Amino acid sequence: AQVADVDPARTVRENILDGVRPVLELIGRFERLPPHSPEAAALEARIAALDGWTIDTRLNELVTSLSAPSLSLPAANLSGGELRRVALCRTLIGQPDMVLLDEPTNHLDTEAISWLETYISRGRGTFVCVTHDRAFLDAISDRVLELSHGGLYSFEGGYVEYLRGKADREATAEQQELRRQRFIRREIDWIRRGP
């Protein structure tokens, strides 16, 4: 579904930071520790491993790059496109290993689309995108999957390579079907002639 799962009772900032809530909880725990606590070094290393010390930088980059609304606005006042951008920021701020994006370029301007292409192409994690935006698909893809007639077909490369591979697959299937029909005609002729 292309519905943004954003809490209308919270601000843009709070909704986006939900994407890193576990890391923020670790930071809060770290900040409450007494100085020179034996737990501090291990907790600090864990936060660093999760890239927790860069959350504010990532937040500002995402909001700016994806043209998200002001961080202080309540989500209840946002348009559908703004809600989708907030949800996209929330997803990306957590730097997940795998992301499923449904029509990610909807409601993005050309600068935001260009930034998203670069972000995805940097290669941190796996991105599975469902999109009709062929230029975006060609820019970000190293593999295209097609679901067709009950089959799943995989094509190495972007959209252009997909079109070539699909044309080759369809031409091969057409040749196989012609051979099958010729064989059936020969069998029917043989049956009609009798043994």
How does the language model describe each region?
Residues 1-178, 191:
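ABC ATP-binding cassette signature C-motif
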Residues 178-194:
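Short cytosolic helices in intracellular loops of multi-pass membrane proteins
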